[in-house]
UniProtKB/Swiss-Prot annotation:
Gene Ontology MF, one: proton-transporting ATP synthase activity, rotational mechanism
GO cellular component, one term: plasma membrane
GO biological process: proton motive force-driven plasma membrane ATP synthesis
Compartment list: Cell membrane
Name of the protein described by the UniProt record: ATP synthase gamma chain
Protein keywords: ATP synthesis, Cell membrane, CF(1), Hydrogen ion transport, Ion transport, Membrane, Transport
Protein source organism: Leuconostoc mesenteroides subsp. mesenteroides (strain ATCC 8293 / DSM 20343 / BCRC 11652 / CCM 1803 / JCM 6124 / NCDO 523 / NBRC 100496 / NCIMB 8023 / NCTC 12954 / NRRL B-1118 / 37Y)
Amino acid sequence: MASLQDIQRRISSTKKTRQITSAMQMVSTAKLSQIQKYSAGYGSYAARLEAVVEHLVSAHLFDNADADHIPLIAQRPIKKTGILVVTSDRGLVGSYNANVIKQTNVLMQNLNLDTSNTTILAVGGNGADFYKKRGFEVILEHRGVSDVPTFNEIRSVVKTVTSLYENEVFDALHVVYNHFVNRLTSEYRDVQLLPLTGDTLNAMGGTEEQKAELNVQATYEIEPDTTAVLNVVLPQFAQSLVYEAVLDAKTAEHAASSTAMKGATDNAKDLIGRLELQFNRARQAAITTEITEITGGMAALE
């Protein structure tokens, strides 16, 4: 049985751990609120950009586009697939990273992908380290994403992603990450981003009635020509989708961290309660033993 001193040390140590995890929970909660406010602002821009692309789709620009001169919609035989994996750099985020990696491995199995026909683009150290150890080619590795990443911070990543596709380093691109649902829930998402197609873009948000309305209103005169317009709009749109995925994943990361630290704090509180009960019982037993010994000694003297 542990001594009273040992139990006291464990209680003291657990209380210190509880203080740390409680502080980390509060920090993560504050970061979550901050990034949610920022995301709402960027969401307005992203929604307008999406509306522009939807209008271009409804105007049948993709039907008449010269895919040979618009790299992001050019479809070619898929010899190599790129997967942009968004994870965190650190732990203490519950099952956040494990979920992304597990589901990405399932995606690879479904698409018959392995080290020979897959290239990894990693935002976050966990994903990069995992796939490096398993022999995958990691051609892009971005660590140290800030708590509230701005577009300027991620600019080099999003531009590199589209540039690699245009240069035929890979022939299709999937973006995989955890989508923030609420403070307690996130869900895995796999978006086949490139090549962009009219069908893909036409499947974006909105009811059939809304799309029909867009189609009626979508009458455009294109200057100088369709190719020039799409070569300006589509890279911005693709880069915006990549940035949105990083921003969404970072939001889910803060939520996962807050939840994990709350769980750790609650567990520490429960453990302290059990240790204090154990301490009180041990002290009571020690006092009872001392009283018995004293009583026995007095009886012997008589």
